[in-house]
Amino acid sequence: MKQSISERIHALRMWFKPNIQAFIIPSTDPHLSEYVAPHWKSREWISGFTGSAGTVVITEKKAGLWTDSRYFLQAAEQLQGSGIDLYKEMLPETPSITKFLSDELPPGESVGIDGKMFSVEQVESMQAELSAKNIQIVFCPDPMDELWENRPPMPESPAFVYDIKYAGKSCSEKIAAIRTELKKKSAESVMLSALDEIAWTLNLRGNDVHCNPVVVSYLLITEKKAVLFIAPEKVTEEVRNYLEEQQIEIQNYSDTEIYLSDLNSSSILMNPAKTNYSVFSSVNPQCRIIRGEAPVALLKAIRNEQEIKGIHAAMQRDGVALVKFLRWLESAVPSGTETELSIDRKLHAFRATQDLYAGESFDTIAGYKEHGALYTIRQPRKATQHCTRKVFFSSTQELNTWMVLRTLHVPLR
């Protein structure tokens, strides 16, 4: 039987009593991603709010959602009748989550979190602010494993190799460059958690996150070896052979923290903003943790010649699809039969006919009249007869990825 939002909140309260007086549920996953697989949409499940950014706080008596200005209208609409209050971030009258908890909880009480869902920086910041009020953070297992009936499974789609003719550099070349940068930082190893950084380093892609061609995994690079932590079912024979050729060791995703606890390395570079607290805390105490940005972000920001060619080619292909769509739009909309959803489908169809099309980088969002203000919501709404403007975003192709925003007046001339 489907639970209401109030029933879900009540179940969570029963779960954390009596040892915990509040629980925080963010929007992210163990890799601190902005966009996550359905398995980790816990904040959406507990609140009914479908935006990509937001944090829910449940106390024994109150429930609140903190989100940014992109989602104020959407959140107000979706939270109606849920018993969850909307807290609009960045407004002077809105308390921070830690200020809210400091005011709501008496000294000596506890706030529960899943350490896999918060960065090291976030945890340390919350601990500093809450400890000033004698409120402690308690690390808990994920309560959704018990409470969320029919929870979607962990991502199971297989990984695949991204062809070097598009990547421009081999996996071994990239790892060599990373090791060179590690020496400059006097680090023997580095732990990568960000999914885009792992995908770039290994030239591996996947379909684990909608519109994001990444593979849920961790990557450890030391002076002498590289270890990919990934669910076994995601490794096809082709991928296994490829990783062996690149001298990448494969370990089970679920064994990441166990492996780090036995790590035989004198030092490891970890980014406290991109590493979850649980993984960070699992490192062998004998291994010195060097806090800092992993070299991957800067290395992948420097485009090689093949990547630059790919950008140009992808822009040309998407430009052709866009021109065809605009021509169709001018003649189709005045008929009054097109909806925001049908326009979305038509734009997708024009793009899908282009060579090397690999899917959307962002679901097209078409907004007419008052829906133009709800530029973060994609859902089937009926467009009115006299459509005068549309807003939409762009797609991804195998050669490159980007986003396009347009406001159109019909007729276009």
Where are each of the predicted segments found?
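Flexible glycine/proline-rich, aromatic-decorated loop/lid segments
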Residues: 80, 282-296, 392-413
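Flexible, glycine/threonine-enriched loop-and-boundary segments that flank and lead into catalytic domains
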Residues: 348-352, 365-392
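Conserved hydrophobic/aromatic beta-strand scaffold that supports enzyme active sites
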Residues: 55-57, 218-220, 365, 392-394, ...
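Conserved helix-loop functional segments at active or binding sites
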Residues: 331, 349-357, 371-375, 399-403, ...
